[in-house]
Amino acid sequence: MRKEEIQAEHKRLRKVKKNADAGQVRAESIGKSSQTPMFRNYLTGVGPLVKPIIKRNDYLREFSKFEKDNASAMQKLLVEAEELPKATAQNWNTKREAKIGIIADRFLYESLEVAADFIPITPENFREAIPQTDVLLVVSAWRGLNEEWVNLPRRTSGKRELLEKTIIPFTKDQGIPVVFYSKEDPPNYESFVSMARLADHVFTSAEEVIPKYRKDIPDGIPVEPLRFGVNYKIHNPLGSMRHMGREMVFAGSWMSHKYPSRAASTEKMFDGALRAGLPLYVVDRNLDLDPKSFKNLEKYMFPDRFVANLHRPLPHDELLRLQKLLPLAFNLNSVMGSQTMFANRVVELLAMGTLLISNYSAGVNTRYPSVAIMDTELDTQQFLETLSDDYLRYCQVEGIREVFLHDTAFDRVDKILNSVGISTPTDDHRILVVANSQAEFEQFQQAQASDFECTYVPSSEASNIKGSEHGDLVIFANRLEAFGPDIINDAVAAYRYSAPDALYITAFDSEAEAYEPTTHDNGISKPATAYWINAGEMVDDATVETSMTIKSSFTSNN
């Protein structure tokens, strides 16, 4: 056989194999689709038939059969979410006085801005703005706050050259330290590492790449991990226990060509939720992409068995409200082996009182034990089918506490400022524990899984307590239902996202309405469990203007 004939035969066989592989994928997809509620609805005459989807037009055509009903269901949830309370103040942390120049994308900027005075740096304002700052924070940004840093990841772009050859040297000439933070490690390490070479201090989202930085940047530049943090005004649990439904809303993109492991996890968890009978809405961020601007849109299509669950993209603020309203959510990590790099929605959703169902992440598994890690479709199905209201509430409480003790914007900003020698306030507040006796105080103290120091106040002297300079937390141990291990931690966490005059602390499985700020015109009639007293103030139920009930990790069955 001649060489040309052999090559032609190889080409034909490759085509046959490609078609066979595609056929196998299609057969598996049809097999799974035939087991979904969507297909059962078709067989019983309740819903339309979803035909096999090959092209983008097929995808949109089949989606149109379900668009109206899904949009209506989501709109009802959005109306409910619109009534959720908003956080406007917290008592524990003071805004840092440092002025931080920042180059970042909007989500990262908004996650930090509450903690200090941030000044956005642009290609136009840097000469005037940078001399006003104490430090320049350069973040691995894709577009900036208002498109001013588009193309920054491209090492040959004009914006990159301006930053590295003009702005950073200009900053150092002013005697202002430069901090670089890569939130894109490890997948986009190479795109931004040249910025790290110019910094005085480097932070990375993935501690596993620190050895690479040691090799690639000059000796003497410190490198540390830095996880994502939350802005309490955006991510908080206020109103998070109103809604008792089990709807699940996932907002994201299908990118199996780039993240095959994540795509496989997505299918398993979505299939498990549908088998468990939960309403699932998939906000497809790529659904409205213009085919004139993007090629091969088929690679962004979710598997056709999920087309009945699709919803068009939603504004970010609406998604935030939905996520805060709903007690359950999926999280999909693209990076699974890192102890510090995982989806930022992990800390955001936990802060909003969400029980998170996630694929595996080493860091999530280590740091957030309340997150339900799912490996298979059956895991997901059985977890959701057996999930009790009590366990749901327990996980919500655990997540809220963990994030607001360790993962706030103040925690992250303090680490950034301290890295270049800028001191930050310690936010010291006395924690005064009122008990009927020294023995009762010691019993309470020994039960706590807390590092916070607390001071004993005999109940006979409670009326004489006055707030110190920065305000104090007063806990009445003699009013508690039980000495759960997290009373102090939960109270402190509450004052990192809210500012009520009084707190009622109850069991996670109690019937009490929780995380709902309440105003009072004439004080409170029922004495509270804890109080915040500002400098010179005293505990006085008659002057309490705001209160809130929170839940803790003890059970009402004690």
Where are these regions (language model features)?
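C-terminal amphipathic helix plus adjacent low-complexity
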Residues: 37, 41-44, 51, 58, ...
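Extended catalytic core of nucleotide-activated donor transferases of GT-like folds
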Residues: 78-218, 337-338, 362, 366, ...
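Catalytic core of nucleotide-activated saccharide and alditol-phosphate transferases
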Residues: 66-82, 171-276, 407-408, 413, ...
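Conserved catalytic core of nucleotide-sugar-dependent glycosyltransferases
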Residues: 207, 484-550
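Boundary detector for helix-to-coil junctions that initiate low-complexity/charged tails
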Residues: 1-69
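Catalytic binding pocket for nucleotide-activated donors in carbohydrate/polymer assembly enzymes
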Residues: 113, 196, 220, 299-316, ...
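Short beta-strand-to-loop acidic/aromatic patch adjacent to the donor-nucleotide binding site
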Residues: 468-488, 492
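Conserved catalytic-core segment of nucleotide-activated headgroup transferases in glycan assembly
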Residues: 232-233, 237-325, 435-453
